[in-house]
Regions:
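Predominantly extracellular/secreted Zn2+-dependent metalloproteases
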Residues: 23-174, 184-226
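Bacterial N-terminal signal peptides that target proteins for export
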Residues: 1-10
Length: 226
């Protein structure tokens, strides 16, 4: 995504009130219950539902939009579908998603940016799933970009769509996370599922089109859920 300019940046997020933390735990429990219910009802007959993981960071636990986006995307990757298969299957895909989300911070970037990964790269080997992937030191969600807003400010024009998805929707949030996930994992051929797009608009569009092609049906279903 054009959203991945390689620059160094950091953000500190603090949570100062016990009441806020208590509310966050209730939020997480509520969303996990909703996701487990949807997974149970998604098939026919009796379905064994694996427990959803705890939020991978305090930020994901406390931020309602980010929390919901994480569990929406986790739910997509937990299913047996074209999207999860593209990422090597559910066990691998969900492990890397949770690791990615554990690194996320919120920053105020230029309005068209959705998510940005930058800095030192670490290679990770997850033994239980035999998954090898990479992580960037800095992973930023733009607090005034399409993940959270339709406009970056009251005086600016509407933030443009990414692919087929309107800004500040459940669909675009999952789309952004899945796009970034594609830059962290390799396919069976040894190449990154999505090559680094950096500042290349053409490559960014190609990468976005690939995610929409393989995950579009699952992303579309998010708009039908409450």
């Amino acid at each position: 995504m054009r959203l991945r300019n390689f620059v160094m940046s950091t953000t500190l997020v603090s949570f100062g009130f016990i009441s806020a933390n208590a509310s966050a735990w209730l939020l997480e429990d509520e969303l996990k219950h909703r996701m487990e219910t949807r997974l149970t009802n998604s098939g026919t007959g009796t379905t064994t539902v694996p427990p959803l993981p705890a939020a991978p960071s305090a930020l994901v636990r406390n931020d309602r939009i980010l929390n919901e986006a994480y569990y929406d995307t986790y739910r997509i990757l937990s299913g047996d579908n074209a999207c999860s298969q593209f990422f090597g299957g559910s066990p691998k895909a969900t492990v890397v998603l949770s690791s990615l989300m554990g690194s996320v911070q919120k920053e105020y970037l230029e309005g068209s940016v959705g998510m940005r990964m930058s800095g030192e790269i670490t290679t990770v080997n997850d033994a239980p799933t035999q998954t090898k992937y990479r992580l960037f030191k800095n992973v930023a969600i733009n607090a005034k970009g399409p993940f959270y807003r339709k406009r970056s400010s009251s005086t600016e024009m509407t933030i443009p769509r990414l692919g087929s998805y309107e800004p500040n929707t459940k669909a675009i949030r999952a789309f952004i996370l899945l796009h970034e996930l594609g830059h962290l994992m390799k396919g069976d051929d040894g190449n990154w599922l999505l090559p680094d797009d950096g500042k290349s608009e053409a490559l960014s569009r190609d990468n976005s089109a690939k995610i929409e092609n393989v995950c579009g049906d699952q992303i579309k279903n998010l708009s039908r859920s409450n």
